[in-house]
Amino acid sequence: MRANEASKKEKIMNTIKNAKFTRNDTLCTISTGDLFSKEDLTGLNRYYKSWKALNEENLRFKMRRANLPELLSEGLASALFGWVRTNATSISGCSSSSCDLVNTETGELIQLKACSTTANTPAGPTSFGPRSEFDTLIFMHLDCEANTASFYKLDANVYKDWMLNRIETIADQQAQGRRPRVTILPKIKASNIQPFYVYSFE
């Protein structure tokens, strides 16, 4: 088989249907999900390089950097940790399907937030829905200077007490039906939270 033919047939993630897991003694089912594997890391590394090169060209032409793609956050997390990417699909047995990933071994619903930084671009804000339901909050910091993705595990309840201004917390704005926005990376640094995993792009 020629090299270009092999490239065209390169394996790219698995789409799984009706994946079952148990959460709080309740059987739940993900109607359709994406499961990446270590074999997908080659493609993800290539995608990262293309995205980084695009941003460098954007800046050269004085354009804004492209947003961090979900493939480089949720897709990478799925490949590294074996979590199923829900891709906003329905999950029977759960009152909410607002999570991004599911650990089908433990039954954890995972919300993943991410940001990317460069030497001249600080971390930007992310938002939480007013009715977000999840068990574990994961934050990924993609450092485009070091070419690393650092994963942090945050308390899924403590984040609601983060102050957004002098009088309101995330929980306060969620109770008002609003979508609070917060820059997470400085709060991680201030709390001296260490990453549980650091991935280096090749």
Functional labels for PLM-detected ranges:
Residues 2-109, 113-202:
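Nucleic-acid endonuclease domains
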